[in-house]
């Protein structure tokens, strides 16, 4: 009898490294997770230790196999998904980083971004990389490291230093320095990559003074990049055959591989991506144009919108307002009242993301009357997550001309049935919640498995995609639009709050 085979997905996130073992039916067999240190050298600066990222990720890989009681020769392939934009520069010879990883959340390169804007680069960057000028993306982080570590730019020109996002760093370590690659999805988040020519952009490299010699080779999201030995000693060599940035991996894990399919991930914030097929749609409504995975890991394009406060607003109800003891309580209290009694909560604690991009907006509660109680405020806070998702979807539909028929959802907050029903109500479209909630890891596993023939094609994967529950709109169009108009009025009044009058 042949031994049963499995796929391992490595999910390297912002606060923890995880490894997930899946079988041929896409069932999760075991999970291992390790958190690592968040480093805050100055206000607004965020770093990770790349060696700690590697140590936690490699140990979860060994651990997860031990937990599942399977041997390395039962692993058909490994897929990697990762926090995007986080930037690492290391020595080619020794494999030692020359500086800590600069994390996607880090704002230290705001001044470099202001220079780019003053130099009139906004339109070029939008047209060629699909992005907006923001410290979020990798390009300015690489420049900062080369500007601040003495002699590093010259060393990079001589080919002594390498740059990579987290996927590139992990593969370099897993292959003992034999393979220096990234995939199209991660490259598209660097602000150094031309999403139309599918190559590093010479003008961006010149403007940021980044030597091409230090950049990884860019490959498809589903192919064999190299092989690794788990534990580092002899034994079976396992192919590494899937890579995707976390949000694109979730899009693929939800099997949103056709034009017009979309998913929303409800975490601390919300990330909504819509596959636009082979067409890169330039956004006129505050969204990003990015690369996604097509049916066999080839290049598709997507529109992406990020909402800053989703689960974080529920944490605020719990930690600061003390209105609930646990995030799970929010559903119970929200359903104790029939409606919000006219209340709208705009959770713009750190400004507003897509499609408004207003850093001066601040959180506000509107419509308070003597009859408003805590349950109304809890309900209005939950509803704000759904309203913000509609804001992003309206922008997507305006940009793409595509009408959404169903939204696939994942992330912690999708367990909240009240929120999912209200999301369907306010969008006027079906909301589909999958049985397997680990869709980011699932996406990495699918990409890796397809590359080595573990799964033959997407049709085979579609059979495994079980929708656990479907939510359908339960309110009339007039009611939907009336409520949404109230939200838009509230947002307008919360905007520009911190802007100082002359």
Curated annotation (Swiss-Prot):
Glycerol binds at residues 84-85, 136, 246-247. PANTHER family: GLYCEROL KINASE, SUGAR KINASE. ADP binds at residues 14, 18, 268, 311, 412, 416. NCBIfam families: glycerol_kin, PRK00047.1. GO terms for biological process: glycerol catabolic process; glycerol metabolic process; glycerol-3-phosphate metabolic process. GO terms for cellular component: cytosol. ATP binds at residues 14-16, 268, 311, 315, 412. This is Glycerol kinase. InterPro entries: ATPase_NBD (IPR043129), Carb_kinase_FGGY (IPR000577), Carb_kinase_FGGY_CS (IPR018483), FGGY_C (IPR018485), FGGY_N (IPR018484), Glycerol_kin (IPR005999). GO terms for molecular function: ATP binding; glycerol kinase activity; metal ion binding. Activity of this regulatory enzyme is affected by several metabolites. Allosterically and non-competitively inhibited by fructose 1,6-bisphosphate (FBP) and unphosphorylated phosphocarrier protein EIIA-Glc (III-Glc), an integral component of the bacterial phosphotransferase (PTS) system. Sn-glycerol 3-phosphate binds at residues 14, 84-85, 136, 246. Pfam families: FGGY_C, FGGY_N. Pathway: Polyol metabolism; glycerol degradation via glycerol kinase pathway; sn-glycerol 3-phosphate from glycerol: step 1/1. Keywords: Allosteric enzyme, ATP-binding, Glycerol metabolism, Kinase, Metal-binding, Nucleotide-binding, Transferase, Zinc.
